[in-house]
């Protein structure tokens, strides 16, 4: 049995009882990485020397009253979150040797909570992708079956947790990039409300959509991690000044009287039978605990995919214009003049998917098309947000599948961008509306790959999401299932 089969609270008891040390936890992580990483490929950079030194430092503090909330816990960090002195690449050749000179706010908070960073995790390049096949270095594999993708863009973050390489990890979610890989890898992933967690130090993909969040084995551990990283940050103008409650205190298991909305669009065309049946089975579990559910409509969700790709690509084309070979990152050697520098650096440094989205975004923002595409997409985004607000006027949470199907095979969709993009049809509306949502394991497909249940909440009501997710988790045994890697 791995130490990482235990929860944060259980590991803290073991530490305080001197049954284990922080060094034991760190060594457990690196031993597991040594055993499986050649197959999973979840990490891009390891930080062994610093992690072991930090473990020794914390071992001397075991039992102290001022220890952090996550004292001694090993964590992996997605490689688009900057870490002072630890390479941050965004899984792109453009930033292959980028060494940040500051920590992201979430990294500062993790350090204050006494976590230990094991390393930086693989991802789709600049967070653009749904399978982790767009990494500029190598593709991460799904620990449940190495022939399948782990999802994306936080594929390394989900795979590392599912493989038992770390206790938990941080990912980022722009259109489903925490929840979708969490579903594919059979773990728990939360996209917080936009503004709940600081984005300072997150390399931007689409600034109005990006949000950092936790990936864990259990709902309780997820609440621990969100507790540690949430809160107002004056370094981030989009950070919200909204009180952070006690997420752990709300894990009561009580859902009696809960009003659940189930959008008909989330169980209709394009959603596989396995995903549909797993959600209906989950609703029966919650009904048995005293919750009620009704079918509702989110009528503008059918426009979400087009809206998202217009807006996110437009923002990406602006955000990624800073990578020009002048200030930092890769610089092309094939340069005769300034135009060569820009053109060749970006052509050589960016992968195909990133180039595709930059071109799409540049087109949407160009003169003559701005009103027809970008401005219209913003208007539709408002309609989508209004749909959620209308439903939440009468219901506590919205529930549906996280993904239309279980994970697909490596290489199956990489040459068909539209089919790949459609994997996010159930997660994208949440980002457009800015509301929080969690994915928890809820079953398996015929291919024995995990399925996820998506629970969506009102703005800044992560507490209710956690309460429902925890109640479902404790009433089922899906969270106890492990990849047999």
Curated annotation (Swiss-Prot):
It comes from the Bacteria. GO terms for cellular component: glutamyl-tRNA(Gln) amidotransferase complex. It catalyses: L-glutamyl-tRNA(Gln) + L-glutamine + ATP + H2O = L-glutaminyl-tRNA(Gln) + L-glutamate + ADP + phosphate + H(+). One of its GO terms (molecular function) is ATP binding. The active site is at residues 78, 153, 177. Pfam families: Amidase (PF01425). Keywords: ATP-binding, Ligase, Nucleotide-binding, Protein biosynthesis. Heterotrimer of A, B and C subunits. This is Glutamyl-tRNA(Gln) amidotransferase subunit A. It comes from Bacillus cereus (strain ZK / E33L). The lineage of its organism: Bacteria, Bacillati, Bacillota, Bacilli, Bacillales. The gene is gatA.
């Amino acid at each position: 049995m791995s130490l990482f089969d235990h929860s944060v609270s259980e590991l803290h008891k073991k530490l305080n009882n001197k049954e284990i040390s922080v060094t034991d936890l760190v060594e457990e992580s690196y031993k597991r990485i040594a055993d499986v990483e050649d197959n999973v490929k979840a990490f891009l950079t390891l930080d062994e020397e610093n992690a072991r030194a930090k473990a020794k430092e914390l071992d001397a503090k075991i039992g102290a009253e001022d220890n952090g909330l996550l004292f001694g816990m090993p964590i992996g960090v997605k490689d688009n979150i900057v870490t002072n002195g630890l390479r941050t690449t965004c899984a792109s050749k453009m930033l292959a040797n980028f060494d940040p000179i500051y920590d992201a706010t979430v990294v500062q908070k993790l350090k204050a909570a006494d976590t230990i960073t094991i390393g930086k995790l693989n991802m789709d390049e600049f967070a653009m992708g749904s399978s982790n096949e767009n990494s500029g270095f190598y593709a991460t594999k799904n620990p449940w079956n190495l022939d399948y993708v782990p999802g994306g863009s936080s594929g390394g973050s989900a795979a590392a947790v599912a493989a038992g390489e770390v206790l938990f990890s941080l990912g980022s979610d722009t259109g489903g990039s925490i929840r979708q890989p969490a579903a594919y890898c059979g773990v728990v992933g939360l996209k917080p409300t936009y503004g709940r967690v600081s984005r300072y130090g997150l390399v931007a993909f689409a600034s109005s959509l990006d949000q950092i969040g936790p990936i864990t084995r259990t709902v309780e551990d997820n609440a621990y991690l969100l507790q540690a990283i949430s809160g107002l940050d004056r370094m981030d103008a989009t950070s919200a000044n909204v009180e952070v409650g006690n997420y752990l205190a709300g894990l009561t298991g009580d859902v009696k009287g809960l009003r659940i909305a189930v959008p008909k669009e989330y169980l209709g065309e394009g959603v596989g039978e396995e995903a549909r049946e797993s959600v209906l089975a989950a609703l029966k579990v919650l009904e048995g605990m005293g919750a009620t559910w009704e079918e509702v409509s989110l009528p503008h969700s059918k426009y979400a995919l087009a809206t998202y790709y217009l807006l996110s690509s437009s923002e990406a084309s602006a955000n990624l214009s800073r990578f020009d070979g002048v200030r930092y990152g890769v610089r092309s050697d094939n340069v005769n003049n300034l135009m060569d520098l820009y053109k060749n650096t970006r052509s050589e440094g960016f992968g195909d998917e990133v180039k595709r989205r930059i071109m799409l975004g540049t087109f949407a923002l160009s003169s003559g098309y701005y009103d027809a595409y970008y401005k219209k997409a913003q208007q539709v985004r408002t309609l989508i947000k209004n749909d959620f607000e209308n439903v939440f006027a009468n219901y506590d949470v919205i529930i549906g599948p996280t993904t239309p199907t279980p994970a697909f095979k490596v290489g199956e969709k990489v040459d068909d961008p539209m089919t790949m993009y459609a994997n996010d049809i159930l997660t994208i509306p949440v980002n457009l509306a800015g509301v929080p949502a969690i994915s928890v394991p809820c079953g398996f497909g015929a291919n024995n790959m995990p399925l996820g249940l998506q629970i969506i909440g009102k703005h800044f009501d992560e507490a209710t999401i956690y309460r429902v997710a925890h109640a479902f988790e404790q009433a089922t045994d899906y969270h106890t299932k492990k990849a047999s890697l």
